[in-house]
Amino acid sequence: MGCFGSPTSKQSDVNSEDSKSQKRRSDAISRQLQKDKQLYRATHRLLLLGAGESGKSTIVKQMRILHVDGFSETEKKQKIDDIKKNIRDAILTITGAMSTLNPPVALEKKENEPRVEYIQDYASSPDFNYPPEFYEHTEELWKDKGVLQTYERSNEYQLIDCAKYFLDRVSTIKNPNYTPNEQDILRCRVLTSGIFETRFQVDKVNFHMFDVGGQRDERRKWIQCFNDVTAIIFVTACSSYNMVLREDPTQNRLRESLDLFKSIWNNRWLRTISIILFLNKQDLLAEKIKAGKSKLSEYFSEFNKYQTPSDAIMESNDDPEVIRAKYFIRDEFLRISTASGDGKHYCYPHFTCAVDTENIKRVFNDCRDIIQRMHLRQYELL
């Protein structure tokens, strides 16, 4: 009689080992799926919404500075081209508007006319390479009173918010060894197209922030982000009260923002998602109100009868008219949320300046408890 096991016994052992191996793999997959599910449920997903140029992407940059590792030297260097383009777009737009405004604006110094011709004829080229004379012409034009007067009328045409900031810094940016600082990165304007996700952690709590384009043709992409959102952060540019849309020169920007907020607030798919309202660009709003050239009442007649509310917080050095203006804009949004609120979602307003890191740090810290409560309610833990 042989001393080896039968072939049937061997096959049975192999099958048994395969079954054990398959079960181990299956158990490992199940454990991983359970971990992923727990991580997903523990993550706060924040959707940034708002009209174009409201400051959404700047908020995302602040989250990177505050809660990730900021921007590497390589990333900063990569931003130089965008910053130079901001300078070019700014001086091109301002000098181009001088003749199209009604009434038009003349240069203070006639000898600057060739500089304007250079900017309009050469700097507009798609493959423009920013030679030294470009910076020289730009610096001299930025000193011209006619150019400055045209800048002050920028609500009459389309100009990027960061125009003055970068035109003031041309002498630094033209340096071959220039590296952007954090404020340069925050101020740099690049059109957002598509959906961008930023992940960060605060006190061991995971956040995913989704930034989507705000122009009208970008908004159809928003619906892709609505699934399982913890909260919406709606960003509005308060300083846009005297401006019109790039994509529709007949529509006031702040009214567009109010209409957009109303459509989101009343959307049947979002009835259980609360909105954190960032009343942004408070610095620019204050500048405009103090200058007195574009009165809020000229664009919103309701402001004439508006009284500063009793809950307004005012410091000793605050301008009463600026306070009245910012609370008026706040209350225009709250009027929408209270008119159709059903108790299932709420609006939490905050005054923000997206380029001010300390301001955004404080505001986001104030919002974290609200977001946590929304998250617990989302998974019926509250």
UniProtKB/Swiss-Prot annotation:
Instruction: List all Basic and acidic residues biased stretches.
Output: 17-31
* Chain segments carrying region G2 motif: 184-192
Disordered: region residues: 1-31
List of residues binding GTP: 50-58, 186-192, 211-216, 280-284, 354
Domain G-alpha stretches: 42-382
* Gene3D superfamilies reported for this sequence: GI Alpha 1, domain 2-like, P-loop containing nucleotide triphosphate hydrolases
Q: Which family does it belong to?
A: Belongs to the G-alpha family. G(s) subfamily.
Protein name per UniProt: Guanine nucleotide-binding protein G(s) subunit alpha
Taxonomy of the source species: Eukaryota, Metazoa, Ecdysozoa, Arthropoda, Hexapoda
Q: Which gene encodes it?
A: G-salpha60A
